[in-house]
C-alpha cells in the first residue's frame, strides 16, 4: 500500500485542496472500514481515496472523510488520476472510476484530469420560510441574497444545498453557526452547503465557499461535486450555457486558493469537472 498526499485543483504544492491517496497493490484486498476511517482521521484531510486497479482501464475508488465513507469526491478523484499519471501507472487516455456513485469516465491528458459527474438533478427547491432558515445559519438575512436566485438542493454525485450570495464581500465575511448548519444538513439529507457569488468582473464564473460540518469539514477549499452541482444550477438559470468552460475560485478564505473547471460533454447532459493535482508528500505506514 502506497500513501500520498496531493494538492488538488492546483499546480503548486501547498495550494488547492489536500487529499490522501492510498494505492493498493493489485492482489491486495481493501482493508476493513474502520482501518480506512482511521487512516483518513490520521491524515486529517477532508477526504482520503483508496484506489485499486481492476484492469488497465478500470480503477475502483472508495472515499473516506474522518467520520464517514462517502459515495464520491471530486478533488480526491482528480488527485488519484494525477498521482497515477505522475507515477506512470497510466498514460493519457480514457479510464473508468468505479465508485459508489456509479462508474464514471475519466479523461487524462497532459495538462488536466477531467471527470464525469453523475447525471445532475435538482432534488429540492426551498420555500420562503426555509430560505430564511438557510441564510440565518450563516448569520445572513435576505438582503444579502440575490433577488432572482433561490437556494436549491442539487446532486451530481453528492447532495448539496446551493446558496447564492449577493456579493463577494458578503461571501468572504459570513459567520457560520455550526450547529444550525449541521441541523440543516440532517434535516434535508445533504452532505453540506455550497455558497457562491457570481464574478461581477467576469474573469471567473463564480467565487465559492463549501461548508460541511456534518461530515467533519467546517470548510473545504475545493470541491468537484459541489461545483458540478453549481454548474447545473447556473445553467438552469441561463447564466451559463452548455458550450462554456466555467472557472470556479474556491478556498481563498482558507489561504488555499483553488481553481476548478467545469463543462458539459457533447451530450449536453453530463457535466465534467476538470483540474490538476500535485503530489506534496509520500508516506509509509508502519504496522
Language model region names:
Residues 1-72, 78-287:
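Active-site proximal loop and beta-alpha junction motif in alpha/beta enzyme cores
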Amino acid at each position: 500500500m502506497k500513501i500520498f498526499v496531493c494538492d488538488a485543483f492546483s499546480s503548486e504544492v501547498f495550494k488547492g485542496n489536500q487529499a490522501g491517496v492510498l494505492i493498493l497493490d493489485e492482489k491486495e484486498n481493501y482493508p476493513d472500514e474502520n482501518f480506512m476511517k482511521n487512516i483518513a482521521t490520521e491524515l486529517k484531510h477532508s477526504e482520503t481515496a483508496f484506489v485499486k486497479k481492476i484492469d488497465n482501464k478500470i480503477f475502483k475508488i472508495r472515499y473516506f472523510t474522518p467520520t464517514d465513507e462517502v459515495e464520491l469526491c471530486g478533488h480526491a478523484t482528480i488527485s488519484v488520476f494525477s498521482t497515477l499519471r505522475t507515477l506512470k501507472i497510466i498514460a493519457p487516455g480514457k479510464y473508468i472510476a468505479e465508485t459508489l456513485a456509479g462508474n464514471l469516465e475519466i479523461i487524462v491528458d497532459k495538462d488536466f484530469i477531467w471527470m464525469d459527474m453523475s447525471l445532475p438533478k435538482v432534488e429540492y427547491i426551498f420555500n420562503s420560510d426555509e430560505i430564511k432558515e438557510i441564510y440565518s445559519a450563516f448569520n445572513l438575512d435576505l438582503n444579502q441574497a440575490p433577488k432572482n436566485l433561490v437556494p436549491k438542493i442539487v446532486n451530481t454525485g453528492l447532495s448539496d444545498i446551493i446558496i447564492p450570495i449577493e456579493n463577494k464581500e458578503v461571501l468572504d465575511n459570513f459567520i457560520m453557526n455550526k450547529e444550525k448548519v449541521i441541523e440543516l444538513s440532517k434535516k434535508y439529507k445533504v452532505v453540506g452547503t455550497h455558497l457562491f457569488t457570481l464574478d461581477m468582473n467576469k474573469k471567473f464564473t463564480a467565487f465559492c465557499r463549501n461548508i460541511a460540518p456534518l461530515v467533519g469539514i467546517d470548510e473545504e477549499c475545493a470541491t468537484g461535486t459541489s461545483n458540478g452541482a453549481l454548474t447545473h444550477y447556473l445553467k438552469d438559470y441561463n447564466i451559463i450555457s452548455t458550450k462554456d468552460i466555467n472557472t470556479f475560485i474556491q478556498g481563498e478564505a482558507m489561504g488555499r486558493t483553488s481553481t476548478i473547471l467545469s463543462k458539459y460533454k457533447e451530450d449536453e447532459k453530463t457535466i465534467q469537472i476538470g483540474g490538476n493535482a500535485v503530489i506534496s508528500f509520500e508516506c509509509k505506514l508502519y504496522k
